[in-house]
Amino acid sequence: TGADCSGFTSYVYAHFGISIPSYSYAQRSVGQEVSYANAQPGDLICYAGHVAIYMGNGQIVHAKGTAYGIVAYDNATYREIITVRRLL
């Protein structure tokens, strides 16, 4: 798909009736901050310039770019996590 990371997360949350900003940096301040140790499926995992949705068991789903589309990744800590946000 042509979705970028924040467009993907905005789309998923909109499906559940939750409106969030369409820019990754703005998504860092929505909802309630929780620690990564307390992350639950559906939480936003925010990185520098990127955002993903936590699936549980250390896994995320995110838009990786036009070459890859929407992908699951089994290592949420593959880069430094800026914040974890809970909206649900």
Residue ranges and their predicted role:
Residues 18-37, 49, 55-88:
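Aromatic- and glycine-rich peptidoglycan recognition patches
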Residues 1-24:
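Secreted/periplasmic proteins that engage bacterial cell-wall peptidoglycan
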Residues 1, 37-38:
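Residue "hotspots" at secondary-structure boundaries inside conserved domains
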